């Protein structure tokens, strides 16, 4: 009986469902997971056809995380090379949600700073050139002092690291958040010593929620011109791409799928045709429902690539715009009702407060009048 001959192993090449479009100059991508090893973020990005991607360098809700395994770092570099990602320009990690470098409590600010610098050093270990984070909050303290503390800590961090650019993200504007208006970001950048090491990430949902109307091509261009005039075009380092579940100026950070929110598809068509936004990471952070996977990002990336070259009066574009708008109609109505109810409640509270203040002032005037009468009466008695 002849010996059994083992069939040679055939290496099967994996073909991702969504191929990367390497002909476009736009770096459309998404925030991907890195579970199981930081290198997995690279293949996850490839699988959805992303030309850029974001990831968490460690748990965004923990202060301390284990150091990277050297083998994982090596594999990260190899996969970036294999799949044609330049870590210096194509990757935009997102900082921890715990960070608040402007905290008025010194010990808490220092705790945030240690975690912040750890993130930056992880970036440099991975040869990543950009690092995005939320600027924090002044809490109950003085806002200008919080901006100064934030800038001071960024300056410290720059001196402790070598090349990674620190990218401040604009915010939706609720509470005492830093960065809900562009002036905050300008004020911080003005205080940075090495300005080559700082940049800005504009989030479409945050901008709209903070009151900047960018819902069509003209309004987007006006907003970008405002950014250029106030801060400077050279500082625009990345875009976070999200529609908004909340109306304009609602100060709510509620991301929505492209075209289904109050922004609508038009701004994303405008972005996909805005040459000045080429060659920087444009990263999706749209919600993934329980019954969905990261593949939804692959679909939205292809939508963005399809929008490139489409005009506002293109019949296919109009059909897609209306289709997505209809899909989000129910949620928009629900959030509009909540917003209107909250606005009405706040207006009532403000009116009540004004009325109370008016009553207090009237009582104070009456007391002042009584004091004057008493003083006059006493003076008259003394004179007599």
Model segments located where?
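Active-site beta-loop-alpha junctions enriched in small/polar residues
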Residues: 31-35, 58-60, 96-98, 136-138, ...
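A general structural detector for well-ordered alpha-helical segments in enzyme core domains, enriched
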Residues: 41-44, 72-80, 115, 119, ...
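Alpha-helix N-cap and loop-to-helix initiation/capping positions
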Residues: 64-72, 103-115, 141-152, 176-184, ...
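Histidine-acidic metal/acid-base catalytic patches
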Residues: 2-17, 186-204, 208-384
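Acidic (Asp/Glu)-rich catalytic clusters
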Residues: 43-49, 69-92, 119-127, 155-162, ...
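Conserved, mostly hydrophobic/aromatic
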Residues: 45, 94, 123, 131, ...
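N-terminal pre-domain/capping segments
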Residues: 1-93, 101-121, 307-310, 318-384
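Active-site acidic/histidine proton-transfer and metal-coordination neighborhood
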Residues: 100-199
């Amino acid at each position: 009986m002849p010996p059994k001959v083992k069939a040679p192993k055939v290496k099967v090449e994996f073909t991702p469902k969504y191929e990367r479009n390497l002909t476009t100059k736009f770096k459309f991508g998404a925030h991907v997971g890195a579970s199981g090893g930081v290198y997995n973020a690279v293949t996850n990005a490839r699988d959805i056809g992303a030309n850029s991607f974001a990831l968490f360098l460690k748990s965004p809700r923990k202060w301390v995380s284990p150091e990277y395994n050297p083998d994982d770092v090596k594999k990260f570099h190899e996969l970036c090379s294999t799949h044609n990602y330049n870590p210096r320009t194509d990757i935009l990690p997102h900082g921890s949600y715990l960070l608040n470098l402007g905290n008025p409590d010194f010990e808490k600010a220092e705790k945030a700073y240690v975690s912040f610098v750890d993130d930056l050093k992880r970036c440099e270990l991975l040869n990543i050139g950009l690092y995005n984070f939320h600027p924090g909050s002044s809490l109950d303290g003085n806002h200008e002092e919080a901006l100064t503390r934030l800038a001071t800590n960024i300056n410290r961090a720059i001196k402790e690291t070598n090349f990674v650019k620190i990218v401040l993200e604009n915010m939706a504007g609720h509470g005492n958040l830093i960065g809900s208006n562009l002036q905050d970001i300008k004020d911080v950048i003005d205080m940075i010593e090495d300005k080559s090491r700082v940049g800005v990430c504009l989030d479409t949902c945050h901008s709209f929620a903070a009151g900047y109307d960018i819902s069509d091509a003209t309004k987007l261009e006006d907003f970008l011109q405002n950014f250029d005039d106030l801060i400077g075009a050279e500082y625009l380092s990345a875009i976070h791409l999200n529609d908004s579940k909340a109306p304009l100026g609602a100060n709510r950070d509620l991301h929505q799928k492209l075209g289904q929110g109050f922004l609508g598809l038009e701004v994303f068509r405008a972005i996909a045709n805005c040459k000045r936004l080429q060659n920087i990471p444009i990263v999706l952070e749209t919600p993934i429902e329980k019954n969905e996977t990261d593949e939804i990002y692959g679909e939205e990336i292809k939508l963005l690539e399809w929008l490139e070259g489409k005009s506002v009066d293109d019949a296919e574009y109009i059909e897609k715009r209306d289709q997505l708008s209809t899909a989000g109609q129910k949620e928009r109505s629900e959030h509009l009702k909540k917003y209107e109810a909250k606005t009405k409640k706040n207006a009532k509270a403000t009116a009540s407060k004004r009325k109370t203040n008016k009553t207090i002032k009237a009582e104070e005037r009456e007391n002042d009048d009584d004091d004057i009468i008493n003083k006059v009466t006493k003076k008259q008695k003394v004179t007599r």
